[in-house]
Regions:
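N-terminal intrinsically disordered/low-complexity leader segments
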Residues: 1-13, 24, 198-207
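Solvent-exposed, non-membrane alpha-helical residues enriched in polar/charged side chains
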Residues: 15-16, 23, 27, 77, ...
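Helix-turn-helix
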Residues: 17, 21, 25-59, 63
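Amphipathic alpha-helical linker/stalk segments
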Residues: 64-91, 123, 132-134, 138-141
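Hydrophobic recognition helices of helix-based DNA-binding modules
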Residues: 68, 72, 76, 102, ...
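Hydrophobic alpha-helical connector segments
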Residues: 77-107, 129, 147, 154-157
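Hydrophobic/aromatic-rich alpha-helical bundle segments in the mid-to-C-terminal region
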Residues: 110, 114, 121-122, 126-129, ...
Length: 207
């Protein structure tokens, strides 16, 4: 029994080591520049040993992408457990958590949103995006101005938030006035643009 436990732990540790090394190589060399032999040298094992755990670089990449999104969703999970009275404030908090996660885990962020597999596959949105959409819908409420625009406004918010996250991770030496102030300005402006007009709409009978 103990021998089996040790073998299982060893397999888990080896798999994690392979994934960690693969993540850095994908970020450094891109999907097309990634080579399983390079990965084997990085881990310090034979090429055959890599294939015991993963059949191809495509499988490796898919696992890394899924792990990154799961990690991001966990970081945003606290918002899903809270039902605050101010959905706009909650939305801004979620967007800030997104940026903070990207800055704290830049390699995972690159895998999730920057490095691409050129093979054409149907794009599948993750639960993290679904959670953002739900918050935007809550902010918009029953505004007629927002009818049919939920997806547009959610995507616009993500585009702005992704933009500042990518810039901060890829241009850390740029003379930013203040990274936190820039983040706050981008998020506040994006939310005002996406939610503000809808919030100003008045229902019938309202003065």
């Amino acid at each position: 029994m103990q021998a089996e436990v040790r073998r299982k732990r060893y397999r888990q540790e080896t798999r994690s080591e392979i994934l960690g090394a693969a993540r850095e190589i994908f970020v450094r060399d891109g999907f097309e520049g990634f080579a399983m032999r390079t990965l084997a040298r990085s881990v310090g094992c034979s090429l055959g040993a890599i294939y015991v755990y993963f059949t191809s670089k495509e499988e490796l990449f898919d696992v890394l992408v899924e792990e990154s999104f799961v990690h991001l969703f966990e970081a945003l999970g606290i918002l899903l457990k809270e039902r605050g009275k101010d959905p706009v404030r909650q939305l801004k908090r979620g967007l800030r958590l997104y940026v903070e996660w990207g800055l704290k885990y830049p390699s995972e962020y690159q895998i999730a949103f920057v490095v691409r597999n050129p093979a054409k596959k149907p794009y599948r949105t993750h639960r993290a995006f679904d959670a953002a959409r739900a918050l935007v819908k809550l902010c918009l409420g029953r505004s007629k101005a927002a009818e049919g625009e939920l997806e547009l406004r959610t995507q616009a918010l993500w585009a702005a938030t992704h933009g500042i996250t990518s810039l901060l991770t890829q241009r850390p030496s740029f003379p930013w006035v203040s990274k936190q102030r820039v983040i706050d300005q981008v998020i506040d402006s994006a939310v005002q643009g996406a939610i503000g007009p809808a919030k100003r709409q008045k229902s019938k009978g309202e003065t």
